[in-house]
A protein has these predicted regions:
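A Rossmann-like FAD-binding core segment of flavoenzymes
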Residues: 25-27, 69, 75-96, 103, ...
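Rossmann-like dinucleotide-binding cores of NAD(P)H-dependent redox enzymes
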Residues: 59, 152, 160-218, 298-304, ...
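FAD-site-proximal beta/loop scaffold in flavoenzymes
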Residues: 125-149, 221, 233-310, 405, ...
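Mid-to-C-terminal Rossmann-like scaffold of FAD/NAD(P)H-dependent oxidoreductases
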Residues: 1, 8, 284-397, 428-432, ...
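Short hydrophobic core segments
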Residues: 103-113, 156, 234-244, 308, ...
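Rhodanese-like catalytic fold shared by cysteine-dependent sulfurtransferases
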Residues: 417-428, 432-469, 477-508, 514-563
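Glycine-rich dinucleotide-binding loop and its adjacent helix/turn
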Residues: 110-172, 207, 261, 267-269, ...
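Beta1-alpha1 glycine-rich phosphate/pyrophosphate-binding loop at the start
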Residues: 1-77, 117, 166-189, 328, ...
C-alpha cells in the first residue's frame, strides 16, 4: 500500500507515524510546502518574545529523523498542486527547483491546515504588516524586530494568537495596541469572563481598542499607520494580523471534494472525504460539535492529532470513529490562565437553548495552605435536562485541572448536578476537600432542588430603585464602604437574624456578597423566614470586574473566609 500525505505538522505527521506503527510494509510519502515537517506551531509566539530562545526547539521532527525512525519519506518545500481522483495521482512541485512530477497513491490523506485571514484592505501589502502561521513567519517577525528595534506594535485581532503575540511583544519591551472589531476579546468566552482578560491586559500596559474596525493601512515615513472606522489612526513600527484563519481548501476544491462550513472539507467520522480513498484531517475539515452535534470548524492541535490517528487506523483497515470536538482550549496571559470548553452562554442562547449558568470564585487549593489564589469559574447547563453545555475558567493555578475535569464530565454525558459526586484528589497543597468542580455541582443541585434562585450581572441595572424590592449587600461594613452598588443596603450576614425586621417580607429581596457564598447563606435564612430571595451569581468581585473591568485580587483567605 502506498500512502501519500499532503501536509505535516499535527494531523499529517501524527497520521504518518501511526500508519507506520500499524503497517511496516506501507510506502509512506509526506509532502510539506513549508521547510518544516513537524513544528510547535502553538509555541511560535514565544520565540518572538524570546521565551523560547533556540529556534531548533520549535522543530519536533525533521525529514531525517522521520526517515531514521519510521522509514517515512518526507519532502519539505514541496507543494501538491493537483489531484487526479480518477488516475489516483497528485502533481507535485519542488518549490526550490521548480521541478514538477506526478506521484501515484493508493490512499491519500489531506492535512493542509488553515490559512491566515488577510482582508483586502488598502495598504495591507506593506512589508511592515505580518501574519503568524508558520516557522518562516516567526523568523521573519523575529528578524524584523531585531533589525529595526521596533518600539510600537499594533495587533489586529484579539483571539488566542493575537493575545499571545501581544503579550510577547509587550514582554519584549514594545508598546502594544490590540484592535478588535467586537466589544470583547476571545470569542470563546462570554463577555463577563472576558472582562478579566481585558483588565489583565490593561494592567500590563496593553492598549485595547474594542468595537474598532480597521479600514486601511498607510505608510508614513518609517511608520505604518492603522486607520480605523471612527477616523482615528494608530502609528506603529509594525502590524501583526491575527484576525483568524480559514480552511486551506484550494486543493480539495480543485479535486471536486465536497466542501462544508466556511469552505471546510466535509468528512465522515472515519475522516473519509466525499471521494473514495481520500481522507482529510486537521484545521481544514468540518467536524461535529460534540455538544450540539452541529457542523462546525474547530482549528486546534489536539483534535488534529486525534483525527490523524483515526484516519491512519482506517487507512490501514481498521474501524475508528471521531466523536467530535468540544473546542477545549487554554491560554497563558502573563500570570493569568484562561480556559474554556463547549458552548458559551451567549452561543447557547443564540441557538435557542434554554440555559442557565453558575459563577463561583473558589480557591486553587485549601485556603489555609500558603499561596492559594482565586479562580473564577462559569459553568453553563441546559435548564430542563441539566445537560452540561460548557465551562470557562479564569485564574492562575489549578485552572487547567478543573477545565479538564469539566471537559471529561461533558464527554461522559454527565448532568451538571452530578459534578458534586466526582471523587477528586485532595491534599491541602493541591485542592480543597470540596473541589471547585464539586462546588459548581453543589450550586447547580441547589438550583435544581429549588433551594435558591439567581440573578445575574446584566440584570442589576434594571432592578427597581423605587422601594418595590429590597437590594441587600451582606458583606461586612468595611467591604461595603470599599465599594458597593447604588441602591443596596448593608446588613452583614452574621447580623441578619437580629436585623431581619429591617427588611420588608412583602417585597422580593435581591442579595449580593463578595463571591456568592454569604449571599447564598443569607438567602437560605430569609427564604426559611418567608422572604422571596434571589442570590447574585458571582458576587460583587465578579460584578466589579465585568462592569468596571477592574483587576481584582488573586489572593484568597484561610478557610474560604473573606476579608
Amino acid at each position: 500500500m502506498k500512502v501519500v500525505i499532503v501536509g505535516g505538522v499535527a494531523g499529517g505527521a501524527s497520521a504518518a507515524a501511526r500508519i507506520r506503527r500499524l503497517d511496516e510494509s506501507a510506502e509512506i510519502i509526506v509532502f510539506e510546502k513549508t521547510g518544516y515537517i513537524s513544528y510547535a506551531n502553538c509555541g511560535l509566539p514565544y520565540y518572538i518574545g524570546d521565551v523560547i530562545t533556540d529556534s531548533g526547539d520549535l522543530t519536533l521532527q525533521t525529514p531525517e529523523s522521520f526517515w531514521k525512525r519510521f522509514r517515512i519519506s518526507v519532502k519539505v518545500n514541496h507543494e501538491v498542486t493537483n489531484i487526479d481522483v480518477t488516475q489516483k495521482t497528485v502533481k507535485v512541485k519542488n518549490l526550490l527547483t521548480g521541478t514538477e512530477w506526478e506521484e501515484t497513491y493508493d490512499k491519500l490523506l489531506l492535512s493542509p491546515g488553515a490559512k491566515p485571514v488577510r482582508p483586502n484592505l488598502p495598504g495591507i501589502d506593506s512589508e511592515k504588516i505580518f501574519s503568524l502561521r508558520t516557522v518562516e513567519d516567526t523568523f521573519r517577525i523575529h528578524d524584523y524586530l531585531e533589525k529595526t528595534k521596533a518600539q510600537n506594535a499594533v495587533v489586529v485581532g484579539g483571539g488566542y494568537i493575537g493575545i499571545e503575540v501581544a503579550e510577547n511583544l509587550k514582554e519584549k519591551g514594545l508598546n502594544v495596541t490590540i484592535v478588535q472589531r467586537p466589544n470583547q476579546l476571545m470569542n470563546t468566552l462570554d463577555y463577563d469572563m472576558a472582562s478579566f482578560v481585558h483588565s489583565k491586559l490593561r494592567a500590563k500596559g496593553i492598549t485595547l481598542r474594542l468595537n474598532s474596525n480597521v479600514t486601511s493601512f498607510r505608510q508614513d515615513g518609517e511608520c505604518i499607520v492603522t486607520l480605523l472606522e471612527d477616523n482615528s489612526e494608530i502609528a506603529a513600527d509594525m502590524v501583526l494580523l491575527a484576525i483568524g484563519v480559514a480552511p486551506e481548501n484550494s486543493l480539495a476544491k480543485q479535486a471536486g471534494l465536497k466542501l462544508g462550513v466556511k469552505g471546510s472539507i466535509v468528512v465522515n467520522d472515519r475522516m473519509e472525504t466525499s471521494v473514495q480513498d481520500i481522507y482529510a484531517v486537521g484545521d481544514a475539515i468540518q467536524v461535529k460539535h460534540f455538544v450540539t452535534e452541529e457542523d462546525t470548524v474547530i482549528a486546534l492541535a489536539g483534535p488534529a492529532n486525534k483525527q490523524g490517528r483515526i484516519a491512519a487506523d482506517n487507512i490501514c483497515g481498521g474501524d475508528s470513529h471521531y466523536q467530535g470536538s468540544m473546542g477545549s482550549s487554554i491560554i497563558k496571559i502573563f500570570d493569568m490562565t484562561v480556559a474554556g470548553t463547549g458552548l458559551t452562554e451567549k452561543v447557547a442562547k443564540s441557538m435557542g437553548i434554554d440555559c442557565e449558568s453558575v459563577v463561583l470564585s473558589p480557591a486553587s487549593h485549601a485556603g489555609y495552605y500558603p499561596g492559594a489564589k482565586v479562580m473564577t469559574m462559569k459553568v453553563v447547563f441546559e435548564k430542563d435536562t441539566w445537560k452540561l453545555l460548557g465551562a470557562q475558567i479564569v485564574g492562575t493555578e489549578g485552572v487547567d485541572k478543573r477545565l479538564d475535569v469539566l471537559a471529561t464530565a461533558m464527554h461522559a454525558g454527565m448532568k451538571a448536578n452530578m459534578l458534586k459526586d466526582l471523587d477528586l484528589a485532595y491534599a491541602p497543597p493541591f485542592s480543597s476537600a470540596k473541589d471547585p468542580v464539586n462546588m459548581a455541582g453543589f450550586m447547580i443541585e441547589n438550583i435544581r432542588n429549588g433551594f435558591v434562585k439567581q440573578y445575574h450581572w446584566d440584570e442589576i441595572a434594571g432592578l427597581p430603585r423605587d422601594g418595590s424590592v429590597t437590594l441587600l449587600d451582606t458583606r461586612t461594613a468595611y467591604e461595603y464602604k470599599s465599594g458597593h452598588i447604588d441602591g443596596y443596603i448593608n446588613i452583614p450576614v452574621d447580623d441578619l437574624r437580629e436585623r431581619m425586621n429591617e427588611i420588608d417580607d412583602s417585597k422580593p429581596v435581591y442579595v449580593i456578597c463578595q463571591s456568592g457564598l454569604r449571599s447564598y447563606i443569607a438567602c437560605r435564612i430569609l427564604t426559611q423566614n418567608g422572604f422571596d430571595c434571589y442570590n447574585f451569581s458571582g458576587g460583587y468581585r465578579f460584578y466589579a470586574s465585568v462592569i468596571k473591568e477592574k483587576e481584582m485580587s488573586e489572593y484568597t483567605y484561610p478557610c474560604g473566609m473573606e476579608k
